[in-house]
């Protein structure tokens, strides 16, 4: 499933993005953020993080540096 989402983003980067002017307000760009989110966190959390990021990418948000959060260790240490 993760590879399907990565393929969609890569298709966008290769065929759609070059035809539009650069408008992303963030670094890394939303498509690069999405790739990294899927690679680090898998399909479900990567999809959630990418959707949240795309919803923030609008003219009323200041943008800036917004890296993908690190994967947290889910194990409880005792």
From Swiss-Prot:
Keywords, alphabetical: Cell membrane, Membrane
Family: Belongs to the UPF0161 family.
Keyword flag Methyltransferase: no
Any Pfam family the entry gives: YidD
Organism whose genome encodes this protein: Bacillus cereus (strain AH187)
Protein name: Putative membrane protein insertion efficiency factor
SMART domains to which the protein is assigned, alphabetical: Haemolytic
Primary location group: membrane
Top-level taxon of origin: Bacteria
Its biological purpose: Could be involved in insertion of integral membrane proteins into the membrane.
GO cellular component terms, semicolon-separated: plasma membrane
HAMAP family per UniProt: UPF0161_YidD
Subcellular location: Cell membrane
Record's keyword annotation contains Membrane: yes
Membrane topology: Peripheral membrane protein
């Amino acid at each position: 499933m993760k590879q399907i989402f990565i393929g969609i983003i890569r298709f966008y980067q290769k065929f759609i993005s070059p035809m539009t002017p650069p408008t992303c307000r963030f670094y890394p760009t939303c498509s690069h953020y999405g790739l990294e989110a899927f690679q680090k966190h898998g399909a479900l959390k990567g999809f959630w993080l990418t959707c949240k990021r795309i919803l923030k990418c609008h003219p009323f948000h200041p943008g800036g540096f917004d890296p993908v959060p690190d994967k947290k260790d889910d194990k409880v240490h005792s």
